[in-house]
Amino acid sequence: MYMASNKPNIVLIYADNHPAVGMGCTGNDEVYTPHLDRLSQSATLFTEAYCPNAMCSPCRASVLTGLMPSQHGIHTWIDEYFKEDWPDNWNAIEEFDTLPEKLAREGYDTALIGKFHLGDAQSAPDIFNKCVTMQIGHVQSFYENDIIDGDERYKHPGHSVDFFTDKAIDYIDQCSEEKPFFLFLTYPAPYGHWPSIQGEPENRYADRFSGSPMLSVPREGISKQAIDWISVLNEKGYGDDGYDVLLQIPNDLPSLRNYYSQISMVDDGVGRVLEALENKSLADDTLFIFASDHGMSLGQH
């Protein structure tokens, strides 16, 4: 994707709950990911890569600090349910020297565009030169999200993937050619949890998955260990809806179609960012990385 240079630009796209089996280039003929498939043909495709923790916040902390959860101390998702107990502008990784801070010292301009989920989103700009993020980490909907955009606060009605893609392209377009940049584009999709994927898809890929039998998702029963784990969470009273809904998603066809449609939305965003780099003649001098915080419990294991 890029030619060797002293300080290449870096674009790190981080999807949310996107499993390795959720791409055409990994053998899934039901999902629609033409841009990721094209990228894989000229890139290194890691087939044995493992996330440090199958929870959102620990993975994000690890990618920004280079530390394992046992080192940075974040072992589960950071839940806004307890936000009233947080210090003002609390940043869960504030004590560590993070990737964007290291790159800034090397002369990079740095930007977080997308989901933060490492404490109070108000604190995200402290470690990035530019920040456009969501005011909460948990994804309740892909639409009507409250946005933190520098000093501005507003609600954006459209799909969050399109919104953050637009912001990423704006950032690339305004970056100086004299200074390398690090763009951490963190999509809050495909996500895979209710209520965000509950029901049939309504985005522009809805027709593609209409009536799909979703044969790429196993139809086996849920293991006893998973049921026991869910029961423990329910007994602890986490959340309002009960974690037993997680057991329903792998066998709920409308939700699965919705989930795959959100994967296609992410793929579309990847394609648009690649095109923006090519249009600005930056593709050959940009290290382009696509990854996910972790996968999604759809029954493959």
Model-inferred region functions:
Residues 4-8, 15-31, 136-159, 163, ...:
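Active-site-proximal cap/lid insertion segments
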